[in-house]
């Protein structure tokens, strides 16, 4: 009996260990999907143009997962080798800290059980992250810092205009060097404590999204239950963020939060991953009128790559959303915001971004317009508004 019990315990621990090793990759593979496709045809003109671009992306959730981004994988959307194959230069790495059970674009309760808690446990994150959203953001930030320290030839962390200038100088002789920035996916990452704004800033965060898929202490989500604007806590948080020159992202904010933030911000707003209602009537997207107000105040609108935002799953659909955005708000206000590794299905991964350049040429955009959208608008914004 004693021998049987020992064998049972051994098998139990083996099963648990196997689960903890295998499960994160299975979840990642199932969440971050690339539609099966034949290799995209890239013309000589598109290939030459793409290789000359500075490509920047405002939104990827790659730090959420257990992948070592220095290695190339056959699942998920991003890692350094694939980014380099796609000629990626600037990437905003966003940190997901809470995802409500049953998450959808229409209505989510802030009291719903949280998917990220189980993911954090399964991926063996520090125990402090199991109960603190701030610790989850800080842990993911530390992952990016560790990558920059371990692989300085391929990644440089950017926190200021001076560091951005240094990065651009280094990239002239090291064209595969990636410039990484940090942002939050919702300011519930503050854990309801304004002091955490400084903690996150000190750890390198330079963009903060106000909401995600549910209402939080700052105000209503576009996909929440209240539809409310900024609360007093939200106004206080925005004031402190602006004082630290943190860039504000309203991607998932209620329309009233966007209106309130526009009224009080002295810095143009970002919509880091989105589509346009006039192009794709989805509850994921705010109204075209608000998009025009954001752009009129100097803001940037970054177009995503997934069906829920652009009503299609092809490079041509991404290009169509971009063309619509240019017609709506102007070529100086459109950028890329893939939402790579954000539990979405896309038509390409980070190695295939030349397919977007090809699609934009096919849509008759000029090379100047393509340069702006693919990264120069992002660069200009960062050069202007980073601390």
Which residue ranges define each predicted feature?
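Active-site core of metal-dependent hydrolases
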Residues: 210-212, 217-288, 302-307
């Amino acid at each position: 009996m004693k021998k049987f019990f020992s064998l049972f315990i051994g098998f139990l621990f083996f099963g648990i260990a196997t689960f903890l090793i295998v499960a994160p990759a299975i979840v990642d593979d199932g969440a971050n999907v690339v539609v099966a496709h034949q290799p995209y045809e890239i013309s000589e003109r598109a290939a030459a143009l793409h290789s000359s671009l500075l490509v920047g992306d405002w939104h990827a959730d790659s730090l959420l997962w257990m992948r070592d981004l220095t290695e190339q994988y056959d699942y998920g959307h991003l890692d350094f080798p694939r980014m380099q194959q796609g000629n990626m230069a600037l990437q905003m790495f966003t940190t997901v800290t809470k995802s409500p059970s049953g998450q959808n674009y229409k209505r989510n309760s802030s009291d719903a059980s949280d998917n990220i808690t189980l993911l954090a446990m399964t991926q063996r994150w520090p125990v402090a992250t199991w109960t603190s959203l701030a610790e989850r953001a800080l842990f993911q930030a530390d992952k990016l810092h560790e990558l920059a320290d371990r692989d300085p030839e391929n990644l440089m962390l950017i926190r200021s205009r001076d560091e951005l200038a240094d990065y651009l100088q280094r990239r002239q002789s090291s064209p595969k060097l990636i410039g990484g920035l940090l942002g939050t996916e919702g300011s519930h990452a503050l854990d309801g404590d304004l002091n955490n704004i400084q903690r996150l800033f000190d750890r390198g965060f330079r963009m903060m999204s106000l909401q995600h898929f549910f209402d939080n202490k700052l105000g209503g989500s576009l996909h929440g239950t209240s539809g409310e604007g900024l609360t007093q806590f939200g106004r206080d948080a925005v004031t402190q963020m602006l004082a630290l020159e943190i860039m504000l992202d309203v991607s998932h904010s209620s329309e009233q939060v966007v209106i309130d933030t526009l009224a009080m911000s002295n810095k143009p707003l970002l919509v880091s991953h989105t589509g346009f209602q006039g192009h794709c009537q989805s509850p994921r997207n705010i109204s075209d009128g608000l998009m025009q107000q954001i752009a009129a105040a100097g803001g940037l609108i970054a177009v995503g790559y997934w069906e829920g935002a652009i009503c299609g799953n092809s490079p041509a659909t991404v290009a169509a959303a971009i063309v619509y955005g240019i017609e709506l708000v102007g070529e100086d206000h459109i950028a890329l915001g893939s939402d790579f590794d954000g539990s979405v299905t896309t038509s390409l991964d980070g190695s295939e971004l030349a397919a977007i350049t090809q699609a934009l040429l096919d849509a008759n955009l000029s090379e100047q317009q393509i340069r702006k959208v693919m990264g120069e608008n992002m660069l200009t914004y960062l050069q202007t508004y980073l601390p």
